[in-house]
Amino acid sequence: MKKNIIIGSRGSILALAQANLVKDRLQGNYPNLSFEIKEIVTSGDKDLKSNWENSDISLKSFFTKEIEQELLDGEIDIAVHSMKDMPAVSAKSLICGAIPDREDPRDVLVSKNGLLVTLPQGAKVGTSSLRRAMNLKTVRPDFEIKHLRGNIHTRLKKLETEDYDAIVLAAAGLKRTGLADKITEYLNGEVFPPAPAQGVLYIQCRENDEEIKEILKSIHNEAIAKIVEIEREFSKIFDGGCHTPMGCYSQVNGDKIKFTAVYLDEGKQIRAVVEDDLAKGKEIAYMAAEEIKNKIVK
């Protein structure tokens, strides 16, 4: 077995935090092996004008193409991606080797002026996400939504120094980068469904690398994988891209799932709630999508 395993990751603070979480889990499971992180610059990192980091769903391959190429070329053994950055189909000869434990999928408010309901009339709230913006406006139509780009630290700095009363971010990014203390309020996932697969990591490897596949089994969470399959299918049904305003929130109790989905159409929040057996898998996504499509037609 190869003794030195190289993990490929983007070089952002969040990406490296995620890669280190994976590295630490693997190192704990395989203390006799050495795990090393290699930083890789992606198209998304180069294109500063269109910095999509921490937005809902990136352009397909925007943050993954170069990392996948290094995996194909044998320069790295494992790739760590945010699931939301992954296209529906992996590059040829690459597979998902593991989906580890999920971080909190909810969105959060980071505020100078209190909770969502106590923010002043006409408060200026920053987000780069159309889904988040439209969800906010359904609850607080008085809000002025201001465009906000940049990585997590850049966004927090803009909140401090620019004309924002609050910003909305993913809980997962703040928690993974040690910034959970910045969170003012966790937004109710049933009212503000997050992006599909938010807070989920996608651990990729070569399809023919049996040793790495075996190693990655040690951090795979099959229960999370089943939920992600449903959420990703819902996204796929609506052709989920970076400008598709939709979200979903999964709550599992035993073998049952409560799947809350939302699609924002012409400023209106169209919702569906499906409560059924988790074993139905992708069928849950189709049930929710059908309910939403019927409401759109009406």
From Swiss-Prot:
Catalyses which reaction(s): 4 porphobilinogen + H2O = hydroxymethylbilane + 4 NH4(+)
Family annotation (PROSITE patterns): PORPHOBILINOGEN_DEAM
Top enzyme category: transferase
Molecular function terms, GO-annotated: hydroxymethylbilane synthase activity
Pfam families assigned: Porphobil_deam, Porphobil_deamC
Keyword check for Disulfide bond: no
Pathway recorded for this protein: Porphyrin-containing compound metabolism; protoporphyrin-IX biosynthesis; coproporphyrinogen-III from 5-aminolevulinate: step 2/4
Cofactor remark from the record: Binds 1 dipyrromethane group covalently.
Requisite cofactors: dipyrromethane
EC number: 2.5.1.61
Other remarks on this protein: The porphobilinogen subunits are added to the dipyrromethane group.
UniProt record similarity statement: Belongs to the HMBS family.
NCBIfam families (UniProt xref): hemC
SUBUNIT field: Monomer.
PANTHER family associated with the record: PORPHOBILINOGEN DEAMINASE
Function statement: Tetrapolymerization of the monopyrrole PBG into the hydroxymethylbilane pre-uroporphyrinogen in several discrete steps.
Protein name: Porphobilinogen deaminase
Gene: hemC
